[in-house]
Every structure is written in structure tokens, then in C-alpha cells.
């Protein structure tokens, strides 16, 4: 692969992210879930101002009703069964209907900490890149695995967003770091090995948190992340309308929002059809 060409491709992708952050006053959202893999809804949220999208394999398992899963917790257990070809098809459809300045980062089987062996090779990464992806959304929990992903992605002009988790998290979604000091250390090392965007898993998706706020411990961890690196930063897990504003003073650049939007879209669909069957 031509190194110069792919470096230029990746730089263009990163500029999309930086432009989105600037456009939205220092903090924007990465819209995922149902808005990441359904071309109609992806187009709709982009028309509303969203600039960053994330199709991923557990969300596509939900969208396809794979093995009857009906919630993200269940989808995480069988996400590795969603093929790279299925993800590429979803990405290609979304890319076809959104403007070129929209950044698309993609979660694929093998890119997360999977429960069964899922090898990733040049073939899979090239397929995703050609489908229209700008980056890989990853959740590796081992340094060697993460380095391999970074090397593969960069070879084909894709950015990598990787995440820091907590050793006690219900699901393993990143390199573990228990204290803010460890978060800072892990983030710095991620930047050193070439990760383009670094996120923190809040742990709020499944563990729960008081409505309208985020725990002080998470604020401290986010500030440690933000203060440690120069690359764009993200927060993921349990973010909704009630607590989104609480992230503002942490300095994090991007809020990853999926389930909250999914729930609103599903509720809107229920409200839309009710008058037709209740007249």
C-alpha cells in the first residue's frame, strides 16, 4: 500500500473530526446505534448537524435481529458473528447518502475484545476502507492487540479510536486503568503507539448512575485523560439527555451516544403509528 497516499487519507479523516469539534464549540457527538447503520436515519441526523457516525457490529446484530437479540447487552454476546461483509455493506450504504465531510468510524468483528477468535487481516481492513470508512472504532484490552490494529488501520488510511476501561467494568471495552493516574499513563502510551483518538468508558451503560449527573470519579478520570494527550478525546457509556451537560466541564471533545438515541427513535415510531391504529 502507498504510505503517502494513506497518510493523506488519514489526515483528511482526522481533520473532519477536528472541524466537527470546532463547529460545535469544543464538544460534539459521535452518533451510533440505529443512526450509525441505517442509511435513512444516518442521513437524518447528519441533516440535523451530526458530523460523526459509528456503525458497529453489535448494533447491526440488533438491527438485523440476529439470533433474536433485542437489547445491546445481548447483542454484545454474539457481535462476533456479524461478518465483515455485512459491516462493509452497512457502511457503504451510509456513505452513499451522507456528505463527504461526515466522519465514519466503524466497529467490526475482531476490533473489540471478542469472546471467540476473530482474526483481522489486510483483507478485512481494506474492505472496510473501500466501503467508505474513515476510521476503526476499537475496544481492544491488550497492548499488543491494539498495536496490531493501529498498524493495520494506518496502512489503509484509517484512523483508530481506542478506549480506556476500568478493571471492574461489567464488559471489557478497553485497556484497564483503575485510578486517574493510571488513566493518564495509559492515555499517553496510546498516543505514543499511534492511536488517533482516545476515549474513556464511563461504566454507566450497565452499572447505572444517578439521573442528571455523572459520578465525580468519572469526572476525575476524564480530566486525567484530557490532560494527558493532544489527540481528540471521547467519553462512551450511558450518556443521555439528562447527563450530557455534566460532561461539558470535563473538557472531553466527543460524546459517544447510541442507546439514548435508539430509545428516542423507537418511542417516536410508537407515537407516530398510534393515531393510525387508535382512530
Tell me what each language-model feature is:
Residues 64-81, 215, 258-279:
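C-terminal helical cap(s) of enzyme catalytic domains, especially alpha/beta-barrels
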Residues 2-5, 41, 48, 52-53, ...:
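Active-site beta->alpha loop and helix N-cap motifs at the rims of alpha/beta catalytic domains
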Residues 45, 198, 247:
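Conserved, mostly hydrophobic/aromatic
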Residues 101-210:
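Conserved anion-binding
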Residues 50-64, 127-145, 197-210, 250-272:
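Glycine-rich phosphate-binding active-site loops on the catalytic face of alpha/beta enzymes
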Residues 1-11, 178-185, 221-229, 240-279:
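Alpha/beta catalytic cores of nucleotide-metabolism and tRNA/nucleoside-modifying enzymes
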Residues 122, 197-242:
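Active-site/ligand-binding-proximal alpha/beta "capping" segment
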Residues 1-33:
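N-terminal amphipathic alpha-helix/helix-capping segment at the start of soluble metabolic enzymes
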Amino acid at each position: 500500500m502507498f504510505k503517502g497516499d494513506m497518510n493523506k487519507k488519514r489526515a483528511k479523516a482526522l481533520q473532519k473530526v477536528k472541524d466537527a469539534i470546532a463547529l460545535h464549540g469544543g464538544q460534539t457527538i459521535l452518533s451510533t446505534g440505529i443512526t450509525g447503520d441505517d442509511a435513512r436515519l444516518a442521513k437524518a441526523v447528519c441533516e440535523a448537524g451530526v458530523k460523526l457516525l459509528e456503525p458497529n457490529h453489535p448494533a447491526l446484530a440488533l438491527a438485523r435481529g440476529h439470533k433474536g437479540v433485542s437489547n445491546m447487552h445481548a447483542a454484545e454476546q454474539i457481535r462476533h458473528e456479524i461478518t465483515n461483509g455485512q459491516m462493509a455493506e452497512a457502511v457503504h450504504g451510509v456513505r452513499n447518502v451522507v456528505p463527504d465531510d461526515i466522519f465514519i468510524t466503524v466497529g467490526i468483528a475482531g476490533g473489540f475484545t471478542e469472546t471467540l477468535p476473530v482474526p483481522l487481516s489486510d483483507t478485512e481492513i481494506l474492505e472496510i476502507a473501500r466501503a467508505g470508512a474513515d476510521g476503526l472504532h476499537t475496544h481492544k484490552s491488550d497492548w499488543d492487540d491494539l498495536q496490531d490494529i493501529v498498524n493495520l488501520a494506518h496502512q489503509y488510511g484509517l484512523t483508530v479510536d481506542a478506549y480506556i476501561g476500568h478493571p471492574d467494568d461489567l464488559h471489557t471495552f478497553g485497556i484497564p486503568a483503575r485510578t486517574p493516574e493510571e488513566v493518564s499513563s495509559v492515555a499517553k502510551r496510546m498516543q505514543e503507539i499511534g492511536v488517533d483518538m482516545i476515549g474513556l468508558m464511563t461504566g454507566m451503560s450497565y452499572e447505572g448512575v444517578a439521573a442528571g449527573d455523572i459520578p465525580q470519579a468519572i469526572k476525575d478520570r476524564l480530566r486525567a485523560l484530557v490532560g494527558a494527550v493532544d489527540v481528540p478525546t471521547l467519553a462512551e457509556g450511558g450518556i443521555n439527555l439528562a447527563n450530557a451537560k455534566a460532561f461539558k466541564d470535563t473538557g472531553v471533545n466527543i460524546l459517544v451516544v447510541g442507546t439514548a438515541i435508539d430509545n428516542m427513535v423507537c418511542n417516536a415510531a410508537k407515537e407516530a403509528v398510534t393515531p393510525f391504529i387508535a382512530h
